[in-house]
């Protein structure tokens, strides 16, 4: 019976010890206060914890518990018997060393369009460099297709069409010149071929009006071809 009556009396004693030890815990780290200081509002802190709290909130220095104003001059150090009698606020709390993570170095990959195998080699993913007008993989095929685009453009058809008439005019001039030295029959025969079609292998005489028109049309269609090429690149 004595043991049964003694057991209930031990439980309140242990709980009271926990309550007593909790009174001396830091309100920030919830551990036994080291270099203890008490704020004017009555809350206990470790000076290293409170100093870090104030340093990280320079524009909002309030008590972590009741949000009243607090700073290093508004706390009172607690000196226990047999402990250090120096003011903990004069100590600089140990701070962790700053760790700055350096970004990985970015090396220029060069003009290795085909990956690891070089410009023409394969085996790796294609490298894309954006210049604002599309990728390089799309730019180079269009550059190589430019002569082909000029070939299939109506330029060749228009030049040959107007060139046939120019060749006929040149043949007319040659026929008239030959008629002066020959007889009338030869002149009539040559003059009959004046308006005929120009041969496919002949071209307009340099400096003639037809040659200038051919050059003008060639430049126009060349500009149109360049315009379409840039339109394909940008759009």
Curated annotation (Swiss-Prot):
Physiological role: E3 ubiquitin ligase that plays a role in the maintenance of muscle cell boundaries and muscle dense bodies, which establish the adhesion sites of the muscle cells to the extracellular matrix. Ubiquitinates the LIM domain protein unc-95, thereby regulating its dislocalization from muscle dense bodies and weakening the link between the muscle cells and the hypodermis. Regulation of unc-95 dissociation from muscle dense bodies by ubiquitination plays an important role in ecdysis during molting. Plays a role in the cessation of distal tip cell migration at the end of larval morphogenesis.
UniProt xrefs under Pfam families: zf-C3HC4 (PF00097)
Pathway(s) per entry: Protein modification; protein ubiquitination
Keyword Cell membrane annotated: yes
Keyword match Cell membrane: yes
Superkingdom, natural source: Eukaryota
PROSITE patterns on file: ZF_RING_1, ZF_RING_2
Listed SUPFAM superfamilies: RING/U-box (SSF57850)
Listed GO CC annotations: cell junction; endoplasmic reticulum; focal adhesion; nucleus; plasma membrane; striated muscle dense body
GO terms classed as biological process: ERAD pathway; inductive cell migration; molting cycle, collagen and cuticulin-based cuticle; protein ubiquitination; striated muscle cell development; ubiquitin-dependent protein catabolic process
E.C. designation(s): 2.3.2.27
Compartments in which it is found: Cell junction; Cell junction, Focal adhesion; Cell membrane
Disruption phenotype: RNAi-mediated knockdown leads to disorganized muscle dense bodies and abnormal muscle-muscle cell boundaries. Accumulation of unc-95 in the muscle cell bodies.
Protein name: E3 ubiquitin ligase rnf-5
Keywords on record: Cell junction, Cell membrane, Membrane, Metal-binding, Transferase, Ubl conjugation pathway, Zinc, Zinc-finger
Annotated region (Disordered), positions in chain: 77-115, 173-208
Compositionally biased spans, kind Basic residues: 188-198
Reaction equations catalysed: S-ubiquitinyl-[E2 ubiquitin-conjugating enzyme]-L-cysteine + [acceptor protein]-L-lysine = [E2 ubiquitin-conjugating enzyme]-L-cysteine + N(6)-ubiquitinyl-[acceptor protein]-L-lysine
Species assigned in the record: Caenorhabditis elegans
InterPro entries found in the cross-reference section: RNF5/RNF185-like, Znf_C3HC4_RING-type, Znf_RING, Znf_RING/FYVE/PHD, Znf_RING_CS
Tissue distribution of the protein: Expressed in body wall muscles.
Zinc finger (RING-type): 26-67
Enzyme class, spelled out: transferase
